[in-house]
């Protein structure tokens, strides 16, 4: 695929991935407007992996992992970063070739570079999800993850969904040949050059300070409990509302991650909180499946 975008900028790099996967037939959807720790939390992955309905999509997802913050001092460790998620259901037999095609679209020459698929099965304890998978290593550095979902929210995936997750900053650093994420060129156009650091460095400094020092522990514990209560109430309605209930799951998960960053949860408590999130996610998954089933799985028609 020839692209009109400059892959040597972070902006052009993302546009190229979107264009490539659009040409493969994916719906290019927009990022979820909530704090999540990974692109898998997006309903287009978590919920759409359930049931028999086919659905292929691709999207950028901003991810927040409060414990990974380093006050803007680490060149490749961030508490806020981007993933590019591709979800293919049912998973095509040539998914590996499609992925390699995306690297070629980004200007990675397979004749020069060493691309390896290293077995690494994936699990998300909070989402009750797991799958068979591989890490993708480019010249010895992990840049992507492949997963064939076997189970989501405790439910078997049939057909199997194929998921590809790109670590955007890491892959872009490789393509731009820089050692610090803050040195990535975001865009270079008529209005001048803008760097990743111009866009996000101050955010990393301030959010790290908030995550580790100022997030209100008492408020976060209450928020977690409130989200759990709201989730259960929404699923207990005469006509359950699994989509709003799922938003409560994500809010509870983020509250837990902030509590983790504040070291407010002991090791034993930590497992208990993970189990509470997983119980919510499982209930949502079952309710969503039943709702689609009641509609006759319309996308199968």
UniProtKB/Swiss-Prot annotation:
GO biological process, alphabetically ordered: glycyl-tRNA aminoacylation
Pfam families linked to this entry: tRNA-synt_2e
Enzymatic class: ligase
Presence of the UniProt keyword Secreted in the record: no
Compartments (UniProt record): Cytoplasm
Enzyme Commission number, as recorded: 6.1.1.14
GO cellular component: cytosol
Subunit text: Tetramer of two alpha and two beta subunits.
Xref: HAMAP family: Gly_tRNA_synth_alpha (MF_00254)
NCBIfam families referenced in this protein's UniProt entry, alphabetically: glyQ, PRK09348.1
Homology family: Belongs to the class-II aminoacyl-tRNA synthetase family.
Protein name in the entry: Glycine--tRNA ligase alpha subunit
The organism of origin for this protein: Shewanella loihica (strain ATCC BAA-1088 / PV-4)
Native organism taxonomy: Bacteria, Pseudomonadati, Pseudomonadota, Gammaproteobacteria, Alteromonadales
Gene: glyQ
